[in-house]
Amino acid sequence: METNEKSRVLDMTRGNPFRLVLKFALPLFFGNLLQQFYNLADTAIAGHVLGDHALAQIGAVSALYGLITNFAFGMNNGLALSLSRSFGAGDEQKMKHVSCWMVTISMSVSIVLMSIFLLCKEPLLILLQVPEETMAGAMEYLTIILIGIPFTMAYNMEAAMLQAVGNSMTPLLFLLFSSVLNISLDYAFMAPLAMGIGGAAFATVLSQGVSAFLAFILIWRNYPLLHFKGKDYQVEKKFVLEMVVAGFSMALMSAIYNIGSVILQGSINALGNLYITAQVGARRLAELFHTPGLALGTSVATYTSQNMGGGNRNRIKKGVWSAFFLFAVWWIFSMVFVTFFVEDAVRLVTGSSNADVIYNTALYLRISFPLIPTMAVIIILRNMLQGMNHLMMPLVGSSLELIGKVIFAIWVVPAYGYFAVCLCEPVTWVVCCIFVLICAFLCRKELR
């Protein structure tokens, strides 16, 4: 294992796979955990200061916001796969080419996304069946979030660049700063300044913008391998096309999953504010316990890409098994939590004293948590396949998740209510887990 102390890069082509995956995943885990704690704090502040109605306003558009952020995350992680392979191969000139086009593609897409969503926001909220009494606040919150899309994309791009060269610690430090700033601004905007639900959105956009700016300064000062000039645009069209395909493949994979969540959110909105509030609390807590799977998935993607680039394919299976073991340990802790402490956590996060809200939030978690390991298998193997440059298989897997959520949203939830919402993800996880396991089995010979 070789690290450069100045830039914190991590060469994952040499050394113990378990230690490498763990070392890279830990900062990602704490970063994701920090992000989820921020989301919990954001929800708790809104719930305690503004009440259940504010939670319903945020919850009504939370799936749409998740679609945007996960598209940005997927796009930049896909673009960064080329950077990881170039780093693993020691090709410094190619790294500059990748950085150049990564910035161009990412920021261009952010402007297009912002424009499209701003033009379509009102029809989208109508399609989501947002209740009339919630519409005005949801519209205000969403508008501010959409204006901040370029900041969201920029920060995700810079974090992906750093992670591609093995540095998962610096993005954690920026996320720590962003979260502390965000929580402070949340309270200031919603309580003393009485900016209402718009204050929560503005705090998010402002903190992401500041973090993106500071990350840019750090990369410019300390990472000459990521610097580029005008001449670095001069590459073969095939090179750019490969980056675009990888970026949009991972973005679409994330987007397809989240489109299903948006459609499902529409069916939840139709159930009324009580279930919207229960769902936002349930998702905040569920996502907190999903964080190790996401961190390990990103670690496996970087580990796989670097070892593919370095010609060390036989090391990849060891890294994947290490990731499975680490998640199994976390799952045991998760089951202890959901068995003994879930109701208290719901009260803390939502600030709600409504017995029906607490019951339905806890029900969602108790049904989904036993099957979280299937979600981890999906994420880890999907990232392994992407690191091996198999882009269609994960995309098909995400499409299966979309189909499952559409079926539940259109037919099952209207018939069986919120109980069907609780069953939706576990059922789709099992189906997609089987598919991804088959894909990994078919690709096993490439790892010899």
At which residue positions do the language-model features occur?
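Short alpha-helical transmembrane segments in multi-pass integral membrane proteins
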Residues: 1-25, 83-148, 192-248, 304-371, ...
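N-terminal transmembrane alpha-helices
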Residues: 12-49, 63-78, 82, 107-114, ...
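Transmembrane helical elements of multi-pass membrane transporters/channels
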Residues: 23-42, 144, 178, 207-211, ...
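Transmembrane alpha-helix boundary and packing residues in multipass membrane permease domains
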Residues: 28, 32, 44, 81, ...
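Helix-terminus/linker motif at the lipid-water interface of multi-pass membrane proteins
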Residues: 37-56, 125-132, 188-195, 255-288, ...
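Small-residue-rich hydrophobic transmembrane alpha-helices
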Residues: 55-115, 152-171, 265, 279-342, ...
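Hydrophobic transmembrane alpha-helices of multi-pass small-molecule transporters
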Residues: 67-70, 182-186, 212-216, 288-291, ...
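Short runs within selected transmembrane alpha-helices of multi-pass transporters and secretion channels
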Residues: 76, 145-163, 171-179, 200-213, ...
